[in-house]
Amino acid sequence: MDSSKKTEVVLLACGSFNPITNMHLRLFELAKDYMHATGKYSVIKGIISPVGDAYKKKGLIPAHHRIIMAELATKNSHWVEVDTWESLQKEWVETVKVLRYHQEKLATGSCSYPQSSPALEKPGRKRKWADQKQDSSPQKPQEPKPTGVPKVKLLCGADLLESFSVPNLWKMEDITQIVANFGLICITRAGSDAQKFIYESDVLWRHQSNIHLVNEWITNDISSTKIRRALRRGQSIRYLVPDLVQEYIEKHELYNTESEGRNAGVTLAPLQRNAAEAKHNHSTL
């Protein structure tokens, strides 16, 4: 297909990245290869958007550390970069709003890629982490331009897809908007049955043409949870995370028993918010 007729795509990965691993980076490469192989798409950008501290996940270390590690991990990539907008929000931001934010930036032509975290100093960049907070307020939605706008799609693993069924973790209207208006590129792991999960969900089945399942033939079972466990036990994580990330973790002694206890006993932000909204809606019936 003529490259001018291909749909341009921006891959967006949201998550904790606690810490970022080589597997996170592989997701982008796998998705890019798959989308290009269809002959219908041209992947022009990859975005890593770490969740903010308000997510309140157990063991989640401060966002500025996770941002810096993600910047270090993508330092040599010419197409995958880190965006700090979600991390800088005072409250937890729903994934659909992050997708919408980036789509609107592309539509209005205000996309300023490549973007770097102010916490990671580069030549000519002297801004501090706190300096960017003044720019962190959500922008008002803008009317999209009619043509030539790249499509933002959510890049994820099968675990995120299957999390759609966890009560109060996602709002049904958000799931519908994600799969209908944006689309998913899901990297499947061994042991997962993403196709069956789609079949069992009316919403996902209805929009299955906008859900791309990518088989990971070279299996890789690296996860942030396993990385943190190894670090707590004093075991090596070399070759599981980029070298610069390993050096940063060791320098700042980031993951230990104490850090794993952060937010212990605290309800995850989406569960708390969605349960409260459901209770309110029920009481008003």
Curated annotation (Swiss-Prot):
Q: Which reaction does it catalyse?
A: beta-nicotinamide D-ribonucleotide + ATP + H(+) = diphosphate + NAD(+); nicotinate beta-D-ribonucleotide + ATP + H(+) = deamido-NAD(+) + diphosphate
Entry cofactors: Zn(2+); Mg(2+)
Q: Name one GO biological process term.
A: negative regulation of DNA-templated transcription
As stated in the Swiss-Prot or TrEMBL entry, residues carrying the post-translational modification Phosphoserine are S117
- Annotated positions binding beta-nicotinamide D-ribonucleotide: G15, S16, Y55, K57, W92, T95, L169, W170
Q: What remark does the entry make about the cofactor? A: Divalent metal cations. Zn(2+) confers higher activity as compared to Mg(2+).
CDD domains reported in the protein's UniProt record? NMNAT_Eukarya
E.C. number(s) listed in UniProt: 2.7.7.1, 2.7.7.18
Question: What interactions and quaternary structure are annotated?
Answer: Homohexamer. Interacts with ADPRT/PARP1.
Further comment: In strain C57BL/Ola, an 85 kb region on chromosome 4 containing Nmnat1 and Ube4b is triplicated. The N-terminal 70 residues of Ube4b becomes linked to the complete Nmnat1 protein and encodes a fusion protein located in the nucleus which is responsible for the Wallerian degeneration slow (Wlds) phenotype characterized by delayed Wallerian degeneration of injured axons.
Kindly provide the name given to this protein in its UniProt entry: Nicotinamide/nicotinic acid mononucleotide adenylyltransferase 1
Q: Which organism is it from?
A: Mus musculus
What does UniProt list as this organism's lineage? Answer: Eukaryota, Metazoa, Chordata, Craniata, Vertebrata
